[in-house]
Amino acid sequence: HAITKLLHYAGNTEVEYIRVGTSGGIGVEPGTVVVTKNAFMPNLEAYYTTYELDQRIDTPTNLDHALVERLLAAQPKDIAFPIVVGNSIAADDFYLGQCRYDGAMRARKDADYRAKFFAKVHELDICNFEMESSALAAFCNRAKIPATMIAVTLVNRFEGDQIKSSAEQLVEFSERSQQVVINYLLSRKDLSN
């Protein structure tokens, strides 16, 4: 809210929000950059629930597809890492919400259930788990601000919960998401002055 209000008071009317981060991949290899077109809750609903006092408000969690296309168009053809466009699941937390087995408490669903769930969501073009996309999408939809998410994957959840990449690889992976945004910003002729 605060940043959006500041931008409004400063007279910035043509803003775009791009969240940059990391995620757990679902059927994509570590180091893949996922550009999110739609955010889903873990129940596979494409809305985010908030409350104003006692009133429930369900806000759609679709992100701006035109912004996604502009981001992709700004990338060099010979970019040295994979970029995919897909959907994301916003889990409630890092461990249980993603059915991980390496937290302080073990997830209640067994490995067979989890594997079937991952296969099901992968068929729905869901490429990653993270925790912010649905809230960001709902906020930006209500505020009528174009938005998307860019998150590099650190692990393929089909292969386990543990990150196996080296510290150097993780730094390089994180820089990939940032590079996608930098390429986009450099392509914007209206920002060159």
Language-model-derived ranges and their functions:
Residues 1-73:
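Metabolite-binding pocket within alpha/beta catalytic cores that recognizes anionic/polar moieties
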Residues 134-169:
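Zn-dependent metallopeptidase/amidohydrolase metal-coordination segment
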